[in-house]
């Protein structure tokens, strides 16, 4: 007989294993590519598709019925075509980019505009600390799949460094209503 050495979360107490397995498994084949996941995603140069697995990530789409309920982090897979990326931004928690396929140029930046960039390949990552301006660009000739994790179950939407994008950072959520 097995012994659980830690208590289940309150919402799982009494839940049969079959229901837990059904609720907490996510499959890529069941995830629709969301090309409007972020406020900047319709702007040329920032087009990308989010596949939400655990929580909504920085998209703010926390009511997505297809996600695994988040606890203390989120996990998404983002598809980035050549020439695309995301706008410089911050989060209130750390954000991790883990490249699964392709090559991705990631950057960190300070308020003076100084930017440092490095290229990540498959099975390489960067952890962007809270409050540090960061982002990525696919400057290669092939698509990229990158796993993105945020260190909070329901993080705020992206804190864009650009004032105009920041003012509209929730606009994509209102358009979906």
Model feature map: region roles:
Residues 1-72, 164-177:
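A short, N-terminal "cap"/entry segment at the start of jelly-roll beta-barrel domains
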Residues 2-12, 110, 135-177:
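Double-stranded beta-helix
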Residues 56-63, 74-91, 130:
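Conserved short histidine dyad/triad with adjacent acidic residue
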Residues 63-69, 86-91, 108, 117-118, ...:
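Short histidine-centered beta-strand/loop micro-motifs
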Residues 77-78, 88-89, 94-99, 118, ...:
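His/acidic/aromatic-lined binding-pocket segments of jelly-roll/cupin-type domains
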Residues 82, 93-95, 99-105, 109-110:
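Glycine- and acidic-residue-biased ligand/ion/polar-headgroup-sensing regions
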Residues 84-87, 105, 126, 130-135:
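Histidine-centered metal-chelating micro-motifs
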Residues 110-130:
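Short acidic-glycine-tyrosine-enriched beta hairpin
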